[in-house]
Amino acid sequence: MRVLCCGDRNWTSYEIIRKELEKFPKYTEIIQGCANGADKILANIAKSIGIKLISSKDNDDIINNSGFPADWKKYGRAAGPIRNKQMLDEGKPDLVLAFHTDIEKSRGTKNMVEQSKKRGIKVVLIKE
C-alpha cells in the first residue's frame, strides 16, 4: 500500500502522526513532500518504525531527503502545486493522509487534497 502524507508546515504533534502511521503494515510505502512541519515529522517517524519512504526520480539526496522536495528556485510560487502533482503522478498513492488543523486556511495541503479528490483517491483529514 502507498500512502501519500501531507500537512501543515506548523504541525507539531509527533504523537498524532506516529499513531496514524502505526496503523499501517510495515510493507506500506510513504510519499511525502519534504516540507517543514508534518512532512518532516512523518518522514522521521516512518524511518524509525521501518516504513519505506518513496523518493522522486529527480531527488538525488535520498539519504538525507527521502521524498519529493519542491523546486522553489526553478518554479517560484508554482513549485508546491507542481510538486503535489509529481507526488501523485510518480507516487501513485492508494490513500492520502492530510495532517492539518484548518484546511480552509491552507494553500499547499488544500491543493494536494483537491488534486487527490479529482483523481478519485481517498483523503483522510487529521486535525491536531
Which residue stretches match the model-derived regions?
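Glycine-rich phosphate-binding "P-loop"
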Residues: 1-13
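Acidic/glycine-enriched connector segments
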Residues: 10-128
